[in-house]
Amino acid sequence: MLVVPTVCLASGDEHDPSQPKIFLRGDIYYANLEPHLGSEQGGIRPVVVVQNNTANCYSPNLIVAPVTSNTAKKPDHQAHVLVDGNRAFLQPSMILAKSVQTISKGRLIRPMGRLSIPELIRLNYALLYQLDLNEWVWRKEAYERYLRYHR
């Protein structure tokens, strides 16, 4: 279910704060990821918004997954999502769920498009894998076991 805040007063456009700007989970933007350190993804590249829509509305930051056109490197990695055929990309690309990061909305350059529902579902599974959420999100008994041993 897609829940979109009806009013997004906290995140107006930086050039015209009276115009609300709504960022949605699954949106694709060009972003400036410089400066970066070490093996962090850097440069001006596409990113996919993975943060929930309520936080997208009220936070000055976004949680994003960077995208690369280097689809040959570890194409079968469970935290990589191949996107082929999405009009936002000029060539097949890979969403790097293993490299999610928090960025300021000011790093966004321009919108590129949106993920399709099947692409977003594949990204959800990649994030569940990367963040090791499968057991905790989908299994109530695991949470109850955690509570028993960590009180």
Predicted regions mapped to residue ranges:
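Compact nucleic-acid interaction/catalytic patches
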Residues: S39-I44, V49-G85
